[in-house]
Amino acid sequence: MRHEHATHSFFTQALSVAEKKAKRRVQSRVMTKRGSAGLGEVDAEYLQERKRACRIASGAAQLGEMFRLLDSFGLQRSKVQKQLHLGMTGAVLQRIFHMESDAEMKVAMTIHRIKSDKQQFMAITPRRFGKTTAVAMFVAALALAVPGITVAIFSTGRRASNLLLQQVKSLLLCVPGAAAKIISSNVETLHMADGSMTSKISSYPGMARTLRGTGGDLILLEEAAFISPDI
């Protein structure tokens, strides 16, 4: 409960910072315009900036929300799963903070104890160690917390890829309000809408000949040792 309260406070604080940044940008643009801008024009421009800021602004807010969601699926994460999630988070930090400075990203890394922002992460675990569930939890939380994200998951075969996407969807349905965001879903792809932004989660069998033109902000290879190197 204490962690959830702290995350919520951090989320609120981050949105407040985003709002202040948006206001400064608007004031700067108004000052450089020829003549004077009417109050209505300023208010309308500020409103648009605030909406944009709250949507993309705070990578810190999105990150805090993602970690909150990881503990909201009704599953108790193991120590290893938490470590996997920290590693996977490091791989997507550049995407989450793509509109912000490296300094802001480093602050968030310190807060959440993320050790690396390298965009490649590999984990080697025994079977039956909860890695597939950990992947499904991470993808579901990321899609909800970061609107507009595109995730591509590659598994060893069609059955495995279908089951993984089903698991992601089941976790999404555990979160109040998430079901309403799912606009389409089939055995291979799930789309979610958040305002004007659409997130896409795809789960494919690892066969290179059928996967031309696929990719995403996050690419996950489950059991990578058994997936064709052509992927």
Residue ranges with predicted function:
Residues R2-I231:
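Phosphate/NTP-binding elements of NTP-utilizing enzymes
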